């Protein structure tokens, strides 16, 4: 399982990055979600890795 936490604001981001964060289910700074470790989630994490914090 992967725990993802949003640590930076989406103000400076382009619409694609905002959509990726929304698809991960993260709304406010500090919100967390847990996911199964699969290729789709890893790809989404790699697109917005500068905005989130990942722990396994």
UniProtKB/Swiss-Prot annotation:
UniProt feature coiled coil, ranges: none
Domain of life: Bacteria
Keyword Ribonucleoprotein: yes
CDD domains named among the record's database cross-references: Ribosomal_L30
An individual GO BP term: translation
GO CC, alphabetical: large ribosomal subunit
GO molecular function, one term: structural constituent of ribosome
Keyword list, A-Z: Ribonucleoprotein, Ribosomal protein
Subunit structure as annotated in this protein's UniProt entry: Part of the 50S ribosomal subunit.
Family: Belongs to the universal ribosomal protein uL30 family.
This protein's name: Large ribosomal subunit protein uL30
Originating organism: Nitratidesulfovibrio vulgaris (strain ATCC 29579 / DSM 644 / CCUG 34227 / NCIMB 8303 / VKM B-1760 / Hildenborough)
Phylogenetic lineage: Bacteria, Pseudomonadati, Thermodesulfobacteriota, Desulfovibrionia, Desulfovibrionales
Gene designation per UniProt: rpmD
């Amino acid at each position: 399982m992967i725990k993802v936490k949003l640590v930076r604001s989406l103000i400076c981001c382009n619409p694609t990055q905002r959509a990726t964060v929304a698809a991960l289910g993260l709304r406010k700074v500090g919100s967390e979600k847990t996911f199964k470790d699969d290729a789709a989630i890893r790809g989404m994490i790699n697109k917005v890795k500068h905005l989130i914090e990942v722990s396994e």
